[in-house]
Every structure is written in C-alpha cells, then in structure tokens.
Amino acid sequence: MNSFTKRTLTVCTGLLLGLSVSTAAWSAKTLDQVMKDRGLTQKDILAAAKTYTPTGGRDEYLAFSSGGQSGHVIVYGIPSMRILKYIAAFTPEPWQGYGYDDESKRVLYQGKLDGEIKFGDTHHPAFTETKGEYDGKYLFINDKANPRIAVIDLHDFETKQIVSSPFYKSSHGGAFVTPNSEYVMSAAQYAAPLSNDFVPLEEFNDKYRGGVTYWKFDTNKGRINEDQSFTFELPPYSQDLSDAGKNASYGWGFTNSFCSERYVGGEGRPPFEAGCSAKDTDFLHVTNWKKAAELVAAGKVKKVNGSYLITMKQAVKEGLLYLIPEPKSPHGVDVSPDGSHIIISGKLDSHAWVYSWKKIKQAIDSKNFAGKDDYGIPIIALKTALHKQVQVGLGPLHTQYDSKACTVYTSIYVDSMITKWDYCKGKVLDQIHIHYNVGHLMTMEGDSVSPDGKYLVALNKLAIDRFNPVGPLHPQNHQLIDISGDKMELLYDMPLPLGEPHYSVAIKADKLKPGVRYKSGWNSRTDSRSKYKTRAGREKIVRKDGVVHVYGTVIRSHITPEIIQVEEGETVSIHLTNLERAEDETHGFAVFNENVQLSIEPGKTASATFKADKAGVFPYYCTEFCSALHLEMQGYLLVTPKGYKAKAGKMEEGQAYSKADYDKQVKTNVDTQAVIDSVVGFITSHNYKDFPTVVALVEDATDQLGFASEAKKKAEGYAKKGDYQNATLWAGQHWQYQVKTADLGLRAKTFLEENGAVKVKK
C-alpha cells in the first residue's frame, strides 16, 4: 500500500470515528433532558425552531442595517439572525482592504470635504426600487456627521461611490428612494449657512438654512449623477427623516422637522432640548420633486456652490413646497404602501398622527391654506390634512407596514414596546414589550409597495441585562418578533457589537444575485478591467515616471514575484491579480511597516502604493488563509540603501536533495495523479456543466493542472542535467499544484453528490 493511500485511509477512518462519536453524543440526551438541564420551556423551543437554520441552509430575508459610528453597513439573515458581513462605506476597514488599496482609497476620496475624513456615522439605508418594489440592485446609506451618501453595489456588496452635499453641515435624514429610483432623498439636520463662511448666530433666522436634496440616480450606470441633482432651500428648522410618495402620492416627497422654534441654546440660555420642544407642533415639509425636476431640466433653476438650488421664493412661486403642522419633535414620516396616508409620531406625544394624502392634495389644488410661515411658505391646517390620531403609547417613533391591509407597527421608546394598530379604523390591536428603549423597527420589505409582514425587528437602543457583560460599553440589541399571527411573539435577541445601528431594511434573499468571482483582472470599484491586470507568466517589474510598478499575481500558495528589490526613496506600486476561479479563494497581502493590507477576491486586481523611504528587509505575505501551505505564501521587499552594490556569490540552501529524494517525490506525484484521474472520471461522467459552481471549480482545477505541467517539465529538465536539487524542488512544486487540483476536484465531486447530479450517457 503506497503512502498516499495510507494517508487517505487514515483521514477517512478518523472521519468515520468522529461521526460515530458525534452520533452517540447526539443520542445520549433526549430533548426533554436538554430542556430540563437548560431551563427551557416549550415556548423557548418553538422560538428556537422558528429561527434555527440548519448547516448549509439559507435565510428567507437579508437585513441591511446601518452601523452607526462604525461607518459601515451590517448584513444579517432573517430568521437566523446570523451576521453575514460588514460592508465598509465611510470608514477604512482592513479585512476588505477598504481604504488600504489604491482603488478603494479613490472611493473614499470622493467623500472628502475640507480635509481627509476617516469616519462616518451611518443611519438610514435604502434599496433601489422598481415600481415601488425592492429590486436588489443597489443600496444607499447616509453619513450624518459629514453629509454624504454612499452607493453600494449588491452584485458584490462593495461601496462604489460617495457624494457629499455642497450645502449641508449634517444630514440625518437620508437615504430615502423614490419608487423607480429616480432620486435619493437626503435632508439637512442642523441649520447652518449654505456656504462655508462664518456667520454669527445673531443672523440665524436670516442666514442659516435647512434643505432637502434629491440626488439623481442613474440606474444604468449605478451611480449618482451630481450634475442633475437639486436641493430645496428650506427654513432653519431642523429637518429630519423623509419618505417618498407612492402610487397616489407619486412625485411628492415628505420631510419632517423639529425645532421649528429656531431656538439656539447655550451661553446662559436653557439647553437646546428645552427651547426646541416648546411649541405643540413642528412642520412636515411637502415637496413636489417631479415638477422640480422638470424646472431643472428646462434650465429654470440656478446653481449655487456648483449645484442646483431651488430657493424658498422660487419653490413657493412654482407651487413646489408646503408645510403642515405635525406632532412636536417627530422622528419618522412613513407613507403607506398605496400612497394614500402618511403616519408621523412625536417623541414627546403618546399618539400617532395619520394624514390623508387626498385631503392634502385637495388643499393644495384649492389653495386652502391656513396662512404662511415667516419665510412665506403656505401652511395647510392640521384639521384639513389629518385623518386620525391614535393613542399608541408614550414616546412613539417609527412606523412600519404589514402585508395585511391597514395594519402597522409603531416603536414606542419610553414604554419600551411595539404597538400593532389599524390606521384606517384608528384601533390598537396588540402590544409587546421589548428590551429596551426601541428606536427604529423594521418589517420585511416594509418600505415597499407590497410589504411581506412575517417578521419584525426591534432595533433597541439599550441591551442592559440581555447578554453576558462585556464592560461599560454594551452591544446593541436587535430583537426578532414573529408577526405572522394576530399576536406578536418575541423569538430572538441578537447583540450587535460594533457601532449603534439606527435603521435597517430587509429584502427577500432571492432578489439578490451576488457574484462569487470577478472577471480576471477586474477593478471592482470602477467595475471595469484594471489597467494593471496581470496573467500568469507575465509578471514583471517596470520603472516608469519615477514609480516602480510591480505587476504580480497571487494563487495558492505563492505570490509572484516573491522577491521585489527597490532602492531607498523610490515609490513602489504593487498590483496583484488573483488568478483563482474557485469560489471563496480570496488572498490577502500585507507588508511589514508599510500600512498595506489588500483583500484580493478571485479575479480581482488590487494595488498598493507607498514610498520605500527606509532601507531594510520587509517581509510580505498572504493574510487570508487559503491552503495547507498558507504560511509559506510569502516574499521579501528588499529596500537597498542608495548606491548599494550587490556582493558576488549565491545563496546556499539548508537542505541537499539526491536522486533518491527526486524518485520518491515523483512516485508520490504519480499516485496523486491517479486520485485526480478518478475524481475527473466521476465529474465528467455526471452533468457537471449544469452546475455553475462546479464549472468554476473545474476551470480552476484545469488552471492548476496547467501550472503542474509546467513545474513537471522543469523538474524533468533538471533531472536530465543531473541537478537533483532543483529537480526535487520543482517536483515538489508539481505535487503542490496537484494537491490544489485534487482539493478543487473533491469539492466539485462533493457538490455534485449533495445536489442531485445525474450520470450522463456517453
């Protein structure tokens, strides 16, 4: 029996023994015993069954949550509540190489304001929509601290674009999407001058302003078109969240506000919170974006700060802007799926206010106004626009819609509960306590024209006693609630430990079609072929325009070139292309002391540029575990002192190899090839071409065999010369490629066996 077969049998025997032990352990305790030992009830077990997703299983929905101070977006599955990914948006993130490779640095640079910003405060994500339905193509997320919007491509879950407001100094109210993704709404938060000039607070009423921006989105290019975007100048009220009209109210946008008192605290005066909540009502802003877009297209809107600005005077003259009283200090404005009603809640109230779009539109058409504000904007009387007021609990915030007609859910901050109610009849249907102090809430596809219902997630601000203590800074608590029946049922608590999520959106998982690899040599940030694409065997080092360009490749388990030599003071630009085609075979790249960390997914080309300003030896390596010999995936950047002259001589290796060593390695290679041939026979005897995953594995395995063939020729060439040192080393490299080929083949074979592949007739 040869050594390869012995090793294979040893592994198989170990797996069988492990299986028998685990089976015995599984049967050792009954469900009743487990429940008793852990103090679980039947209700607990039912909740667990509703959220449990077996190994290899998939969630029905994916949630995309803002990451707050992290500057990221968090992706998790529902109902499993398993975190799947953090998408870097406004903050550098080394695992994804975001803000570390040249390509993503350019994306971050797009969001540069007066200086470099390495932080974002993400709040409100929104999907692109087609006819009011989530289409799963792109996601938008805002940065409150630095008024910006990021565009995330859901084909690869990467940030592609960042745009910044030329007017605002903060923007809490973004992002909100119109029903066909024509525009992304983003409102100012804290009133400030629209210029970057200093303006004293004594001129607050005259020179400080708010606003709401409609960012034009090009659905074909997947990018915001800043040249076709426009902003409404608004009074210095603190604008908050927005929503776009649907169906009956299509073409209109709704933006609420607080501190319409225009109060400024500090310097001996009572705090902002006292003066900003003195009145009984604030203002809902109603904007006609469809007509505004027509004016912009007709050249009737002037540019300020390089962007179209519709002044309050022009908006009033053209009938684009109206105000309606709303409960004071509101936090959320939510349009019903059919566009007929708008629900707003005030944080200091116990009621949710339901507005009728039909009544609002009638008032606009008949010019039925109660008066104007201090800036000349028409005000529609509350009693004219209101449909109902419903008592839902103390501190209502946000509302989400169910699949059932007229049914909604409102988060109640002070009472720490969710209220289910009927907004048509004005009747409370159910309430459930959460833990603790809920902010936003999310139903499945709850912002679309056809919400799914089924589940609700309460995005709680405080966790307190829900989880194991981890110090003074607690995680956030997202609680999953079953809303499929008449009564709400709490299912699961999920800690979120990086940043404070604000809003989340959830989409059917089958609407998402993410890729698993890029075209070879791909710049993922521009979605185009990289000019630094490198193919196997074409690696090179080129000095051009004062820069040392390294055109390299990575593949299990080596980086080419493995030695890079430059002179002290030279600028180095390393461009690496991942040659892998197999799914999930990502490589990383880090260099000692150079702040370099790349994430190079299959097919991607990523670059790192830095100045080698200090002579020395700088090891580099792959940071992503990729194969058995991952640790050997290494190299050296040698930075020679200026004027250095190499010494004569050659390196001596620590191990000498003989013909016997070479023959032994060749025997192993022959045995390994026999295993590969049997796996290939299995794959080709089945309908493997019907499985894209297997096709990719086969392509990658074929590439590996090609590399193996080249290594074999080199080994045989050295053996003919009697150089068994190099012959043995290249024969060993031949075997490394074979092992990777076998690994890919066995993965393909397993996939076929587990996914119903059938034999094909010859």
Task: Set out the residue ranges of the language-model regions.
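Extracellular/periplasmic metallocenter environments
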Residues: 600-655
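Histidine- and aromatic-enriched segments that form or immediately flank copper-ligand environments
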Residues: 161, 575-605, 628-635
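Predominantly soluble domains enriched in secretory-pathway, periplasmic, or organellar proteins
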Residues: 26-541, 571, 609
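N-terminal edge beta-strand
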Residues: 541-571
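Bacterial N-terminal signal peptides
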Residues: 12-20
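Amphipathic, heptad-repeat alpha-helical segments
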Residues: 655-709, 760
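Beta-strand cores of secreted/periplasmic/IMS beta-sandwich domains, seen most often
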Residues: 75, 561-583, 604-614, 618-619, ...
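Bacterial N-terminal signal peptides that target proteins for export
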Residues: 2-12
